[in-house]
Amino acid sequence: LKDKFSFISSRISYSELKFIIKTLCIIPFMIIHVPNKNTLIIDDFKLRCCIGKKGLNYNKKEGDYSTPKGLFNLKKLYFRKDRIGIPKCKINKKVIKRGMAWCDDTEHKKYNEEIKTRHKSLKENLYRKDHKYDYIISISHNERKIPGKGSAIFIHLTDSYEPTAGCVALKKKDFEILLKLIDRKTKIKIG
């Protein structure tokens, strides 16, 4: 079967293969693909992105500056209504307000989930002065909340394409293209 697939895929273009797969409904959902450190592909769009400064890693650990490899669900869009209004998209969404954070304390019971900043734990503030978190999409990395396996892995904004601490980041105009294409069934394949 592998040889047959290699034979077929060597004779048709990526676009043709994608059309065939969509037509046959083999994959009934959209896939965002991040194949390397500076490319994000969705539908017919190839967008520039940046990832963790230590590259892609199947064995993600808290604070290692790598981006986890794998296939993940998109969970929720968080956004700054005061800066960008209410975006139109087909995934669950939530307004980022003062006092919202994400727990990255491996010893805390709320590890890798949204919290209030009043919690006495290590956390990533979601309400920021810069524009990096004007849009955030949380993904299903480490949903079982295994301490030390990584937290706060998002798709968020960048203005410089500097490497991240482990997230995938896009320019605002590209993020807004992404928002128009995704829905609740969309997955992100990293690596």
Tell me what each language-model feature is.
Residues 27-165, 172-191:
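Cell wall/extracellular polymer interaction/catalysis modules
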